[in-house]
């Protein structure tokens, strides 16, 4: 790895195309991108932002976000990207929790009194509006509101151990944990990603994942620019414009959650198909039938990966051809040490299930202000406990079998919801299936399922029950099925079982 801070992590030739913003009809070379970042860094420094100052970016995907993210990092400040669609109360929580000095928003936000602006004002935090200026080819602070942050500061030069990025884990229960990631963490993750997929200046990524999350940020954007390739960054994913822009800008790959893959499978593909070097899937399990259909439809290898915020995104991935990529598996560890441990910290033999634990330069040193979580989440020799249950096969491929905290304890019998999800999704009339634990008077807990049928198909609880009877033990069959055309997901497309439980079981219970 030739770089240890994001200051040096834009590696393309000066005249090569670095960034495309379709909504602005703008393309920047690497030279122009560096100039724009440095110019915005000067503007941020003039506002008084100094080393260690937290800055929130509440801007949708696009050129302004990219330039702002790098500018904040170059100034040695701490970046806290936020979903621009949050409600005011959500903005208040994250801005206050980070103790932000500045909230960066799109042009027009103050006049529109957007939720981010209202939250910042309530907390007496300064607001800066950004806009792309085509004539100067720079991103400018076009409006500033709030108290003076500090005296103008000199330009910073980031150091490897500077905390650069702070993200909150969505978690399955309780208050979100705060994950600090350093320049060194991020750069090691970038190195792992670029090496595992052999990214180079000939590649162009089409970024469909939000940049306020590590999936889109680390893999889609930062790794592309660090390899000298080009990133195409639309404001959000749109099935209508995906193929048009993918072809127009010469994209060679994309990374997404299974939800987006399935939407693209339902969208008529272009004729002829563009050459796609590979498709990456991450952040949620990809059903093997969907993987097979993706490969057959788009004539490209589909590589499933495994990632977490605490590891600056990627921990394992299936390899590119001609090496084997295995359905059901999230591949091999790449750039990290990985062990399967029991509850006492003993390493499990090959093929036996236990907790997936990882260690590496990309892994955070610990959560902020949370000694209890740090004690329970790291082993004595600093392996991070992912909370995921899994096993290794004889070839060293990782298979995730469930989430430890999500295991259903039905009268002493442990059920993995992920296992039943996978079986249900093999049914020809099931598009999505999410199983979850519910309280039960007799067994303590039982399992129920939310089902999204294939469009135009109808499936009954009895049909699903009969189907599962042939596949799994009787105690694993969900007690009840809920049918819907929309499974609740987080803003990044992840399924959280507690959200599904709230939407179906708790909602139906409240009606009683």
UniProtKB/Swiss-Prot annotation:
Q: Where in the cell is it found?
A: Peroxisome matrix; Peroxisome membrane
Q: Where is this motif: Microbody targeting signal?
A: 510-512
> Per its record, how is this protein called by name?
Oxalate--CoA ligase
Could you say which enzyme class this protein belongs to?
ligase
Which PROSITE patterns does the entry link to?
A: AMP_BINDING (PS00455)
Per the record, the similarity remark reads: Belongs to the ATP-dependent AMP-binding enzyme family.
Motif range for FACS?
381-429
Q: What does this protein do?
A: Catalyzes the first step in a degradation pathway of oxalate to CO(2) to protect the cell against the harmful effects of oxalate derived from endogenous processes or an environmental sources.
Q: Which residues carry this modification: Phosphoserine?
A: 283-284
| Domain writeup | The FACS motif is required for catalytic activity and substrate specificity.
Q: Which residues bind ATP?
A: 168-179
- Any Pfam family: AMP-binding
Q: What is the native source organism of this protein?
A: Schizosaccharomyces pombe (strain 972 / ATCC 24843)
Kindly give the membrane topology term recorded for this protein.
Peripheral membrane protein
InterPro entries xref list: AMP-bd_C, AMP-bd_C_sf, AMP-binding_CS, AMP-dep_synth/lig_dom, ANL_N_sf, Pcs60-like
């Amino acid at each position: 790895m030739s770089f240890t801070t994001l200051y040096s992590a834009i590696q393309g030739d000066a005249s090569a195309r670095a960034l495309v913003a379709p909504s602005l009809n703008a393309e920047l070379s690497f030279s122009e991108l560096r100039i724009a970042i440095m110019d915005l860094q000067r503007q941020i420094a003039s506002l008084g932002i100094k080393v260690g100052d937290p800055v929130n970016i509440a801007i949708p995907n696009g050129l302004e976000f990219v330039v702002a993210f790098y500018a904040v990092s170059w100034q040695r400040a701490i970046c806290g990207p936020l979903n621009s669609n949050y409600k005011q109360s959500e903005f208040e929580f994250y801005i206050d929790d980070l103790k932000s000095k500045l909230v960066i928003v799109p042009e027009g936000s103050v006049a529109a009194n957007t939720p981010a602006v209202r939250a910042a004002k309530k907390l007496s935090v300064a607001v800066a509006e950004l806009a792309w200026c085509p004539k100067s080819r720079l991103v400018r602070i076009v409006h500033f509101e709030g108290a003076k942050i500090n005296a103008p500061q000199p330009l910073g030069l980031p150091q490897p151990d500077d905390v650069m990025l702070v993200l909150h884990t969505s978690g399955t229960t309780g208050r979100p944990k705060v994950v600090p990631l350093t320049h060194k963490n991020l750069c090691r993750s970038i190195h792992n990603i670029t090496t595992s997929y052999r990214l180079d200046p000939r590649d162009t990524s089409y970024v469909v994942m939000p940049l306020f999350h590590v999936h889109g940020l680390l893999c889609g954007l930062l790794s592309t620019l660090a390899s000298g390739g080009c990133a195409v960054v639309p404001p959000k994913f749109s099935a209508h414009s995906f193929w048009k822009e993918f072809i127009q800008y010469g994209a060679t790959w994309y990374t997404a959650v299974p939800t987006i893959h399935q939407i693209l499978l339902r969208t008529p593909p272009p004729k002829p198909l563009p050459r796609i070097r590979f498709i990456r899937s991450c952040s949620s399990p990809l059903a093997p039938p969907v993987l097979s259909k993706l490969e057959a439809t788009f004539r490209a290898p589909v590589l499933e990966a495994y990632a977490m915020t605490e590891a600056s995104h990627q921990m394992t991935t299936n390899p590119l051809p001609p090496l084997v990529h295995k359905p059901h598996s999230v591949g091999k560890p790449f750039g990290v040490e990985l062990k399967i441990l029991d509850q006492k910290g003993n390493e499990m033999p090959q093929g036996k299930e236990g907790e997936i634990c990882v260690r590496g330069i990309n892994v955070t040193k610990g959560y902020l202000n949370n000694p209890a979580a740090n004690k329970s989440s790291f082993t004595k020799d600093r392996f991070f406990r992912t909370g995921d249950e899994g096993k290794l096969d004889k070839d060293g491929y990782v298979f995730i079998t469930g989430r430890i905290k999500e295991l259903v304890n039905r009268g002493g019998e442990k059920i993995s919801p992920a296992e039943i999800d996978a079986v249900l999704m093999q049914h020809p009339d099931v598009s999505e299936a999410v199983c979850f634990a519910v309280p039960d008077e007799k067994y303590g807990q039982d399992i129920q399922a939310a089902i999204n049928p294939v469009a135009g198909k109808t499936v009954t609880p009895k049909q699903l029950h009969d189907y599962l009877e042939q596949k799994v033990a009787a105690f694993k069959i969900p007690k009840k099925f809920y049918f819907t055309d929309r499974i609740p997901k987080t803003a990044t497309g992840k399924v959280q079982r507690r959200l599904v439980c709230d939407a179906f079981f708790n909602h139906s219970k409240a009606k009683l």
